[in-house]
Regions:
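Glycine-rich phosphate-binding P-loop
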Residues: 14-32
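Extended, non-globular alpha-helical segments
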Residues: 1-9, 70-75
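N-terminal phosphate/diphosphate-binding loop that engages ATP/GTP or pyrophosphate donors
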Residues: 26-104, 112-118
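Structural motif
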Residues: 19-20, 107-111, 135-136
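Pre-Walker A (Motif I) flank of P-loop NTPase domains
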Residues: 9-15, 101-102
Length: 256
């Protein structure tokens, strides 16, 4: 970390909770936010899209008493959010919150965003600590992701459902290239091609049970593959994380 004339103890603390998809980052961050009263920032490029609330897991994230902030409120019509631009937004938001809070919690699993953030560590005006959440055993992990996929495919309190979000985007040809790059969507598209299902009306047509089971399993498989990649990359990015006792906040994990 770059030298500063400000004593380290006087600099705001930003605690990053990172890890693979579906391992409980939001729950861990929410628990810490409740215990400390600190605001939370979601370091996720996909969760910026308000029209992907179910697919991105943004829906249902609001918790009473916890102040959660996203990097922006975009729609698919705005296009992709590049990693550098997302990191700019993250740094600006954290700096604004850190000006009035001694602790800011950041949670996320975007590889490109967190890699970019780490490359800027020497420029940051705050102390950055990191807690990496581990991967569970493979069978346990895939089972958890399968349950999550089932929830995403079921319209309800957490939004209209993944199939509805995909169908809505697919009806506009200009959105298809970006939609096909989204984890979850790509699995559904693969099944639509295999079973001759119309993507633009996938949310309105009856889907045979065995096909729906295959869609669910494939979404879980794709998310698991991405989770294994996240686990490997974050281990490299945050290599050497060690326990750090932070006055008033207990034991956290630190990146030197």
């Amino acid at each position: 970390m770059a030298e500063s004339e400000t004593h380290p103890a006087a600099r705001p603390l930003v605690h990053l909770i990172a890890g693979p998809t579906g391992v409980g980052k939001s729950a861990a961050a929410t628990e810490l936010a409740r215990a400390t009263g600190a605001p939370m920032v979601v370091a996720d490029r996909l969760q910026c899209f308000t029209d992907l609330a179910t697919t991105s897991a943004r829906a249902g994230a609001d918790v009473p008493g916890v102040h959660r902030h996203w990097l922006g409120d975009r729609t698919f019509a705005d296009g992709d959010l590049p990693a550098a631009e997302a990191t700019d937004a993250l740094v600006a938001l954290v700096e604004r919150l850190a000006s009035t809070h001694p602790l800011v919690i950041v949670e996320g699993g975007s590889i490109s965003l967190l890699r970019e953030l780490c490359e800027r560590r020497s420029e940051l005006s705050w102390r950055l600590t990191v807690r990496l959440l581990p991967l569970p055993a493979r069978d346990e992990y895939v089972a958890a992701l399968t349950r999550r996929a089932q929830e995403m495919l079921t319209p309800g309190a957490c939004g209209p459902g993944l199939l509805h979000e995909l169908a809505t985007l697919w009806r506009d040809p200009r959105r298809r290239f970006l939609a096909a790059s989204v984890n979850g969507f790509e699995a559904v598209l693969e099944c639509c091609a295999k079973y001759s299902l119309d993507v633009g009306s996938i949310d309105e047509q009856p889907i045979p049970e065995h096909v729906l089971e295959r869609i669910t399993a494939l979404i879980a498989e794709r998310h698991a593959e991405h989770g294994f990649l996240q686990h490997r990359v974050f281990g490299e990015i945050f290599e050497g994380a060690v326990p750090e006792s932070v006055p008033g906040f207990g034991v956290l994990e630190r990146v030197a």
